[in-house]
């Protein structure tokens, strides 16, 4: 995990044997309101969050972004530079912006 940034308001769970490439961002919240009045004048206390779960044996490529509410299934691979906004199933290769399944991997017996 090199220069990876994990922002956690409520819950980020990273399983066993997970590899995170350099410069990844993992966040379980939107950080702040999009309304400038709320951010600047009223004080931003309404952070919306949803848990992030990265299951066992996942590989996340460099500079990928994993946003709130996402679960990445076990033994999946996320290509470098991907933006993960939806759940990714187990045993697949996924990538892109937004991240989509590219190929399913054969499961070992």
List the predicted regions and their residue ranges.
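C-terminal/domain-terminus segments
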Residues: 69-99
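Short, basic/aromatic-enriched C-terminal tail that caps enzymatic domains
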Residues: 98-109
């Amino acid at each position: 995990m090199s220069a990876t940034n994990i922002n956690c308001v409520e819950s980020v769970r990273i399983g066993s044997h997970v590899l995170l490439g350099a410069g990844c961002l993992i966040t379980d919240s939107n950080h702040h309101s999009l309304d400038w009045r709320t951010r600047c004048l009223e004080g931003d206390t309404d952070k919306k969050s949803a848990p992030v779960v990265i299951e066992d044996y996942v590989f996340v490529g460099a500079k990928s972004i994993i946003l709130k509410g996402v679960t990445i299934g076990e033994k999946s691979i996320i290509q470098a530079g991907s933006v993960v906004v939806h759940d990714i199933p187990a045993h697949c290769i996924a990538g892109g912006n937004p991240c989509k399944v590219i190929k399913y991997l054969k499961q070992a017996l």
